[in-house]
């Protein structure tokens, strides 16, 4: 984490731990609001995402750390431009909650949610990672590690099993 307090050997305040986890879960629930279903253009969708309820949870200096192939994004606008916009355009048909992040942990200023599999979706366009759409149903193995600072989510590390997703759309990266 940017403030180097990621490793500690003491018990954290349970109230703070519960609050950080609650903040992460509430933000994640807001992600199921899907402005991409009504957007008329990329710029319209970007504007809708900039004003989406998620904005209330992210720190103004947020950093989103995605896996190789997606990369890192700074600020809500960077996150929208480099991950959310392509992801939402590709996976318009998705369900975060049927499988869900069933592992949930709050520990001081840090929280974790994960599910192996955690998201179901339909691969609907080539906007995310550039592979042609085949309308295949996919499941995603995703973990979210959050660092909370100044009452907001400051950092988010998101390992996504891209090899697993690619194999479900017919791309074998191991050949």
Feature locations, PLM:
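C-terminal and inter-domain tail/linker signature
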Residues: 1-175
């Amino acid at each position: 984490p940017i403030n180097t307090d990621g490793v500690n050997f003491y018990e954290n305040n349970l109230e703070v731990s519960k609050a950080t986890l609650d903040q992460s879960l509430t933000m994640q629930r807001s992600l199921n609001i899907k402005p991409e279903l009504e957007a008329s253009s990329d710029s319209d969708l970007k504007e809708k995402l900039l004003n989406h309820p998620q904005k209330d949870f992210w720190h103004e200096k947020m950093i989103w750390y995605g896996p190789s192939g997606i990369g890192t994004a700074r600020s809500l606008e960077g996150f929208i431009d480099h991950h959310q916009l392509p992801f939402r355009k590709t996976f318009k048909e998705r369900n975060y909650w049927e499988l869900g992040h069933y592992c949930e942990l709050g520990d001081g200023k840090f929280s974790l949610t994960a599910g192996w599999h955690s998201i179901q979706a339909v691969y609907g366009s080539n906007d995310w990672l550039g592979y042609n759409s085949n309308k295949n149903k996919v499941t995603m193995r995703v973990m979210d590690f959050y660092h909370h600072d100044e009452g907001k989510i400051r950092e988010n590390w998101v390992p996504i099993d891209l090899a697993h997703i690619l194999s479900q759309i017919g791309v074998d990266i191991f050949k």
